[in-house]
A protein has these predicted regions:
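Active-site-proximal alpha-helix that buttresses catalytic centers in soluble enzyme cores
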Residues: 1-137
Length: 137
């Protein structure tokens, strides 16, 4: 994410602190297309797979994304609940509990590194709420 400076910062607007609770991420559903999209985002990160990009691109797009999403979708379906992905459901519950303990000037949000809620959008939301300090967990 690129730094975006404030052209006209309003010092009269009360500053807030943001608490960003982060987790790795999860597909939006256990459907094959959502699992494929999640795996592509996750496995395209050069910090996750550290081999030359050209070689990895072929392996990822030519092999892994053709076969793995279907197998992984079945595994995701086996742990999925009526509420959704366990990782997302429990992460949201943690955020709600932490939010309830915080004073009014502290914003608590959840972001996933891969998938949704997206890290960049969540950070921009905190910025829009005038959060000038950020605690990342």
């Amino acid at each position: 994410m690129k730094y975006v400076g404030e052209q006209e910062f309003d010092h009269k607007n009360p500053q807030r602190t943001g608490v960003l609770i982060c987790n790795l991420g999860t597909p939006e559903s256990y459907k094959v297309k959502d699992v494929r999209s999640f795996l592509k985002e996750f496995l395209s990160d050069g910090r996750v797979i550290e081999i030359p990009k050209a070689i990895w691109w072929f392996i990822l797009n030519g092999i892994i994304l053709r076969f793995r999403p279907k197998k992984s979708a079945k595994l995701y379906e086996s742990v999925w609940t009526e509420e959704g992905s366990p990782l997302l459901v429990y992460s949201q519950k943690i955020v709600e509990k932490v939010r309830a303990l915080m004073p009014e000037n502290i914003e608590v949000e959840l972001a996933m590194r891969y998938g949704k809620p997206e890290m960049e959008k969540t950070l921009l939301s905190l910025k829009d709420k005038n959060c000038r300090n950020l605690i990342v967990l």
